[in-house]
Amino acid sequence: DTTIRPLYPDTRPKVLMSDTVGFIKKLPHDLVASFKSTLDEAASASLLLFVVDASDPSFRSQLDVTRKVLAEVGATEVPSLLVLNKRDRLGPDELAALKAEYPDAFFLSTRNKEDLQALRERIMGYFESDMIDEELRIPFTAQGVVAEIRAKMRILSEDYDAEGLTIRVRSTPENLTAIKKKLAR
């Protein structure tokens, strides 16, 4: 079954991570249909992460199988990031060769907290690339929108004074437009 969890710690905007079962090369015929049905959501994903054990000599064929199955469910146009895990099990020459072969891949060891944080930042960087930073002035008479701002936008800074709140946010243009309309009322 597919597991869906928010990226932790919580992010604004919320990023949901969907973990599907791993790809198995010789899947029994009776499981193929149910397996593919769990992948239908991949076609509507914003970003696909291919997490692969870089120390497994057969990871390239596993990656090929993954890409073929995703093509079958119509997910070839979905942006993706190749994540090569278990870099701690590779020698320096192996790691250098893989970095040359997969220059856009993200290399990590899930045993290393800094690597996990860097992956989280890379994921957030993808989602924040289309966002803009803006400063909003919210008078005390319009404080009702603050909860919505906190729910949908990343707060960069906030300052209260005698007239209200000045808040600097990072958000999608759509969310900013909606909040500005509410503030203009």
What role is predicted for each listed range?
Residues 11-14, 35-107, 149:
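Conserved C-terminal guanine-recognition region of P-loop GTPase G domains, centered on the G4
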Residues 21-31, 51-59, 112:
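Flexible beta-alpha connector loops of hexameric P-loop NTPases
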Residues 25-26, 58-60, 89-93, 114-118, ...:
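Switch/connector loops and helix/strand junctions flanking conserved nucleotide-binding motifs
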